Design a protein with these regions (language model features):
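Accessory helical-bundle/CTD segments and flexible terminal tails appended to RecA-like ATPase motors
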Residues: 1-123
């Protein structure tokens, strides 16, 4: 599955580019939810590729607010690199990377979002 604004969802190229720009500039999840509502109102029910696209942007916004500089999944491993770290720059449970339990892309993105959401910054 490709995370995108598909041509069969928003057929006009200039509109797609405009929405790509709006999503890239959004830095709060509330802004993304507003954009999602606008897309739903204008274009109807979104295809899976667009849902993945919006979920990835939600993860990006949340990760920035939790001071992560990168989020990557390799197989079942979730690798979250912290902005400030005294020792290990990666978030781990014990000495291991968190494990993702689902292989279905949209559920996996939801799992990543929920994991990052549960992370608490240390002062």
């Amino acid at each position: 599955m490709i995370a995108e604004i598909p041509e069969n969802y928003v057929s006009e190229a200039s509109l797609r580019i405009q929405f790509y720009r709006k999503f890239a500039q959004a830095d709060q999840i509330e802004d993304l939810l507003d954009l999602n509502r606008e897309m739903l109102d204008r274009f109807g029910n979104p295809p899976p590729g667009f849902i993945a696209f919006t979920e990835m942007h939600k993860i990006r916004c949340l990760a920035q607010s939790k001071e992560f500089i990168s989020i990557e999944s390799k197989g079942e491993k979730l690798m979250c690199r912290k902005k400030r770290s005294q020792s290990d720059p990666y978030l781990k449970i014990g000495n291991r990377f968190p494990r993702l339990t689902n292989r279905e892309p949209l559920i996996k993105l939801e799992e990543i979002f929920n994991y990052i959401e549960s992370y608490h910054l240390k002062a």
